[in-house]
């Protein structure tokens, strides 16, 4: 009996076709010709083979993934083109920052327009000044400053004048006379004021020892005040003229309170 190989498991199976063919030949042979020779039938082993079944899990190709990537790239390109065509607007946080910066800039501009240098303005000096009539009668030396609110040099020097004033206000009078006030016409003529700021330095009897006009170093002003406070007969800087504003540019107006020394 022949043996065949199974396709899937590799088991040896008998060859039924060959066995049936032999059986038919034996029946067709005449009985007279039959010889009974005992003979062992040989088994023929068929060739062993195993045909592996086709793998049902076939590897998938990369075409779908490639198509997906291509689709995503097209979508991104389309989105980018739309963004390029549409204007971008700042978010709310950026808008708040811009508004805050604008507010700070406006406050800074307002402070600059006041020219409140060093935190001190001409109005501060005028408010703390000694009235002119009192200064002439209290027996102290006096510094008289002729100024105007529109005088830029006057505003620049205000912090330096204030610092010196705070040091010597107990020994020296500091008087502020606004040239726009018609009340001081006589004093303008008496001291020969042609430019401002004009600083006149008077001894304790009210006699002028010197004057300084316009922008000057802080040390000049301090030296003259120290000389007055020390009772010296003269001041070291008696005739100094720097950059000043012309008194001819003054805006004359009558103040409501004639007692005001501003």
From Swiss-Prot:
<keyword id="KW-0676">Redox-active center</keyword>
<dbReference type="GO" id="GO:0009535">
    <property type="term" value="C:chloroplast thylakoid membrane"/>
</dbReference>
<dbReference type="GO" id="GO:0010190">
    <property type="term" value="P:cytochrome b6f complex assembly"/>
</dbReference>
<dbReference type="InterPro" id="IPR013766">
    <property type="entry name" value="Thioredoxin_domain"/>
</dbReference>
<keyword id="KW-1015">Disulfide bond</keyword>
<dbReference type="GO" id="GO:0016671">
    <property type="term" value="F:oxidoreductase activity, acting on a sulfur group of donors, disulfide as acceptor"/>
</dbReference>
<feature type="active site" description="Nucleophile">
    <location>
        <position position="151"/>
    </location>
</feature>
<protein>
    <recommendedName>
        <fullName>Thioredoxin-like protein HCF164, chloroplastic</fullName>
    </recommendedName>
</protein>
<feature type="transit peptide" description="Chloroplast">
    <location>
        <begin position="1"/>
        <end position="54"/>
    </location>
</feature>
<dbReference type="InterPro" id="IPR044241">
    <property type="entry name" value="TxlA/HCF164"/>
</dbReference>
<feature type="compositionally biased region" description="Basic and acidic residues">
    <location>
        <begin position="64"/>
        <end position="76"/>
    </location>
</feature>
<keyword id="KW-0809">Transit peptide</keyword>
<feature type="region of interest" description="Disordered">
    <location>
        <begin position="47"/>
        <end position="90"/>
    </location>
</feature>
<keyword id="KW-0813">Transport</keyword>
<feature type="active site" description="Nucleophile">
    <location>
        <position position="154"/>
    </location>
</feature>
<dbReference type="Pfam" id="PF00085">
    <property type="entry name" value="Thioredoxin"/>
</dbReference>
<comment type="function">
    <text>Probable thiol-disulfide oxidoreductase that may participate in various redox reactions in the chloroplast.</text>
</comment>
<keyword id="KW-0249">Electron transport</keyword>
<feature type="domain" description="Thioredoxin">
    <location>
        <begin position="78"/>
        <end position="230"/>
    </location>
</feature>
<keyword id="KW-0934">Plastid</keyword>
<feature type="disulfide bond" description="Redox-active">
    <location>
        <begin position="151"/>
        <end position="154"/>
    </location>
</feature>
<feature type="compositionally biased region" description="Polar residues">
    <location>
        <begin position="78"/>
        <end position="89"/>
    </location>
</feature>
<comment type="similarity">
    <text>Belongs to the thioredoxin family.</text>
</comment>
<dbReference type="InterPro" id="IPR036249">
    <property type="entry name" value="Thioredoxin-like_sf"/>
</dbReference>
<keyword id="KW-0150">Chloroplast</keyword>
């Amino acid at each position: 009996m022949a043996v065949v190989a199974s396709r899937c498991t590799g088991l040896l199976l008998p060859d039924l076709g060959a066995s049936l063919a032999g059986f038919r030949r034996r029946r067709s042979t005449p009985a007279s010709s039959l010889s009974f020779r005992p003979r062992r039938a040989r088994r023929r082993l068929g060739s062993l083979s195993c045909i592996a079944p086709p793998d049902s899990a076939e590897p998938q190709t990369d075409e779908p993934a490639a198509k997906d990537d291509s689709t995503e790239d097209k979508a991104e390109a389309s989105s980018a083109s739309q963004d390029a065509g549409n204007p971008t607007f700042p978010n709310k946080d950026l808008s708040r920052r811009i508004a805050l910066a604008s507010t700070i800039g406006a406050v800074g501009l307002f402070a600059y327009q006041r020219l409140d240098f060093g935190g001190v303005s001409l109005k501060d000096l005028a408010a703390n000044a000694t009235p002119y009539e009192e200064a002439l009668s209290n027996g102290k030396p006096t510094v008289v400053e002729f100024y105007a609110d529109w005088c830029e040099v006057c505003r620049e020097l205000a912090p330096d004048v204030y610092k010196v004033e705070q040091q010597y206000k107990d020994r020296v009078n500091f008087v502020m006379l606004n040239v726009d006030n018609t009340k001081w016409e006589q004093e303008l003529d008496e001291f020969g004021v042609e430019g401002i700021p004009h600083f006149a330095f008077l001894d304790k009897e009210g006699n002028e020892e010197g004057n300084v006009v316009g922008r000057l170093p802080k040390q000049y002003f301090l030296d003259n005040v120290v000389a007055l406070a020390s009772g010296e007969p003269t001041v070291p800087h008696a005739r100094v003229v720097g950059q000043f504003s012309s008194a001819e540019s003054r805006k004359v107006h009558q103040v409501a309170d004639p007692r005001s020394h501003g």
